[in-house]
A protein has these predicted regions:
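Catalytic-core segments of class I nucleotidyltransferases/pyrophosphorylases
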Residues: 80-164
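Conserved beta-loop-beta/alpha segment of the NTase-like Rossmann-fold superfamily
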Residues: 1-78, 100, 104, 109-117
Length: 167
């Protein structure tokens, strides 16, 4: 239980005691993506495990990714980091590839990385998204997989959005 809500990274850290002696991988999804299908997730989880990655995340692309963290890549298309919209520059806000908040981590790596996260951002929270940049800097095995159907991973944050999804 997350008594104090100090960000998505902090929320995942609340599972540390439960998972400290576990081996394997953990699938982390934000609670506002009810439309994601197991048939979309399972091949990505299988790919993550079979390639022995430390971290895999799902990305998507839409015309207006307002409200979402942006995927930052280098000139060769390699994932560098995720920047939350509140912290984006005007140029970064133009990026259409965004973070729906679906990650697969090796359990042993997720907590090592999360223990390094700081709160030096606009919200003063522990962002799970900061784990991506830290993993990249640590030369961990990471991959961002862009899915074709962004409708599966659109976040539902209002009753109007939920009604639209149900229709």
């Amino acid at each position: 239980t997350q008594v104090e809500q100090l960000g998505t990274g902090h929320a995942v850290l609340q599972t540390k005691e439960l998972l400290k002696n576990k081996k394997g991988h953990i699938l982390i999804l934000y609670g506002d993506v009810p439309n994601i299908k197991a048939s979309t997730l399972m091949p990505i989880v299988d790919d993550h495990i079979s390639n022995n990655r430390d971290l895999t995340l799902i990305t998507a692309e839409i015309d207006d990714p307002s409200g979402y963290g942006r995927i930052i890549r280098d000139k060769n298309g390699n994932l560098l980091k995720i920047i939350e919209e509140k912290d984006c520059s005007d140029n970064e806000k133009k990026i259409k590839e965004w973070n729906p908040g679906i990650y697969i981590f090796k359990i042993k790596e997720v907590f090592r990385i999360l223990n390094s996260i700081k709160t030096n951002n606009a919200s003063k929270e522990y962002y799970l998204t900061d784990a991506i940049g830290l993993a990249q800097q640590s030369n961990m095995q990471i991959k961002a997989i862009k899915i074709a159907n962004s409708g599966e991973v659109i976040g539902i944050n209002t009753t109007d959005q939920l009604k639209e999804l149900e229709d």
